[in-house]
Amino acid sequence: MLYTLLLVPSLFLLVMPVPSQGWSRPLWYQVGLDLQPWGCQPNSPDIWGCQPNSLDSCKNSLGCPGYWLGLGGNRIYPVAGVTITTTMLLVVSRVIVHRWRAKVAKGQLPAVTSSSGKHWKEQPTVSDRTLVLRVLHMLDAILLHIEGHLQGLASQQQIQIKGSPPQSG
């Protein structure tokens, strides 16, 4: 129950509006993930592709704040949502597994055997390092999927992706 109360502020972050004037780029630029397709006007004076003082010309571009989907009209970036959700799931699952192991150690749960007849306690436990590597692998797969999706959107809207060669007509 205590862990649930600690996660409530994280949930609050999901519904907060993102300050459009405070961040000139999406959240993954803040943490160094380069997934954002380049945006608004190719000859714009701003290096990010948006007008410095006016985001009105950027409403339909992937490269500008405010394009990304939100909850209840408040803007949220998908990578931030995935990161927070994954972190919450990891914390909650860790607490549940810890409680379950404590009950098993006290003998409150019946012993479970696998189909091979081997007792479940005889199976090797998975280390924390292995679990972290598996989670990082899943997050990497999610980011690759998001990047592919963004590249597909960019090619549909004729927007050049940073780092990719320009597409000729």
UniProtKB/Swiss-Prot annotation:
It is a single-pass type I membrane protein. The keyword Transcription regulation does not apply. Pfam families: TMEM89 (PF15098). Residues 23-75 are extracellular. Residues 97-169 are cytoplasmic. Keywords: Membrane, Signal, Transmembrane, Transmembrane helix. Residues 1-22 form the signal peptide. It is found in: Membrane. It comes from the Eukaryota. GO terms for cellular component: membrane. The chain crosses the membrane at residues 76-96. PANTHER family: TRANSMEMBRANE PROTEIN 89. This is Transmembrane protein 89. It comes from Mus musculus.
